[in-house]
């Protein structure tokens, strides 16, 4: 059991993931940090970031992708020391303006699927930016989905095999 110290439930967290050490990575909206929590509920590490962190995704190099929600950004971060290896801001990815960066999913070819939730910006649909897209390791869009009429807001995805 772990108490976040954040009173309003909607300001707490969306997705928890376990890291290689068996601890939980808890991105918190209200405090703009990712907390590493042991299975006993003890804080192991707090890494301060930007925006409203939504989820983390472990990389083979030990870093993590962090979707920074309303920060309109996606970052590759070493959560042990807080060092940012890569950061994509709102207009840094050609062909995909970032809105609320939410769910992340690794692609089989080494790319990254990014859910670009558009619910907090009334101009998002008019911006014609994809709701979900895949980037390669150079940050280039190689696939996208942009069909608000059929799919509405997309915050997370998963694969079905």
Predicted feature residues:
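Histidine-/acidic-rich catalytic cores in large beta-rich domains
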Residues: 1-161
